[in-house]
Amino acid sequence: MSNLPIYNFIRKLPKCEHHVHLEGCLSPDLVFRLAKKNGITLPSDDAAYTTPSTLLASYEHFGCLDDFLRYYYIAVSVLIEASDFEALAYEYFSIAHSQGVHHAEVFFDPQTHTSRGISYDVVVSGFSAACERANRDFGMSTNLIMCFLRHLPSEAAHETFAEALKRNDFENGIVAGVGLDSSEVDFPPELFQEVYKLAAEKGIRRTGHAGEEGDPSYIRSGLDNLSLQRIDHGIRLVEDKELMKRVAEENIMLTMCPLSNLKLRCVNSIAELPVREFLEAGVPFSINCDDPAYFGGYTLENYFAIQKHFNLTVKEWVFIANAAINGSWISGKRKEELLSSVQKCVKEYTAEIQQPKTLETAVEVQA
């Protein structure tokens, strides 16, 4: 099926990523490689850590977000030096580039590392070096988004924010904005109202996870109390029609993560995601991979999953692609470049499907 013309179009479509956690790109192979390099002992009482293959297999059995987070926090313990963080991010950028991602806005969790004695400087210098390499090697534009862990006290978020301000990371463009992640339920957005207010006063961009496992009130609180400019996940927005209308009218982009929602059992099937409802309501959204090392797919696999279950038209894909570009935290010039690339892709696809099919192609389509 992935050989059908529409899938080739999706493969070539210029993509923007807005919801990927760099720590969630830590593949089992890289976990074992860095553990050996840095002398880190992985849990001996868990058979999952026998080999990279057994670790990968264990990722098939997540029951909820917290199940996943357990493996996630063990894996990041292998990240010690700046070169480790650079290797991790560059591995993601390489894969993303191969799948047609032209612009990537990536999350990182400094508190995960500073809490275990790794300095903020080490984390950011490694990730920013990978961003520079991605631009140089692939022509990819990138943004780092610094996330606060919502299961930690808000005071910890203030400390992390102060560290970034001290380094002038927002002013010099090394960090493009702030986000809010980790366990959602029982940690509503309003707990972080003060630090987000400080960010807003300084003109720093703001996003946050809401409406993944939490109900629509988490989304509303994020908008009202944190002045969020984007909503990460947001699939439960569909349960509140008035709020959905507001999000559409205010052009608040959602960053959806289909395979993640399936793996963490937020939905029982990709077909349950409110893709049609969002398209019909004019809610802008992008499609993203979240934590691809754990959830069985990077950006393209998520795009294909949506196509398989919703059979979108080229026009609908153009809406998604353009919404992703316009919702990106990039210059107007860069947006124009990417929008032009989408139109070029559409023209090439239109010309391709208007050509007479060869016998081989016809047989392939029938199959």
Swiss-Prot record:
General function of this protein: Catalyzes the hydrolytic deamination of adenine to hypoxanthine. Plays an important role in the purine salvage pathway and in nitrogen catabolism. Also exhibits a low activity towards N(6)-substituted adenines that are commonly known as the plant hormones cytokinins.
UniProt-annotated binding residues for Zn(2+): 19, 21, 209, 290
Active site positions, chain numbering: 212
Sorted UniProt keywords: Cytoplasm, Hydrolase, Metal-binding, Nucleotide metabolism, Nucleus, Zinc
The protein, known as: Adenine deaminase
Enzyme class per UniProt: hydrolase
Sites marked Important for catalytic activity: 233
CC per GO annotation: cytosol; nucleus
Record's catalysed reaction(s): adenine + H2O + H(+) = hypoxanthine + NH4(+)
BP-aspect Gene Ontology terms: adenine catabolic process; hypoxanthine salvage; IMP salvage
Main subcellular localisation: cytoplasm
Cofactor: Zn(2+)
NCBIfam families: aden_deam (TIGR01430)
Family membership: Belongs to the metallo-dependent hydrolases superfamily. Adenosine and AMP deaminases family. Adenine deaminase type 2 subfamily.
Gene coding for it: dea2
Disulphide-bonded residues: none
EC number: 3.5.4.2
HAMAP family: Adenine_deaminase
Record note on cofactor: Binds 1 zinc ion per subunit.
Superkingdom per UniProt: Eukaryota
Matching InterPro entries: A_deaminase_dom (IPR001365), ADE (IPR028892), Ado/ade_deaminase (IPR006330), Metal_Hydrolase (IPR032466)
GO molecular function term, any single one: zinc ion binding
Localization per Swiss-Prot or TrEMBL: Cytoplasm; Nucleus
Temperature and activity: Optimum temperature is 33 degrees Celsius.
KW Metal-binding (keyword) present: yes
Gene3D superfamilies referenced in this protein's UniProt entry, alphabetically: Metal-dependent hydrolases (3.20.20.140)
Native source species: Schizosaccharomyces pombe (strain 972 / ATCC 24843) (Fission yeast)
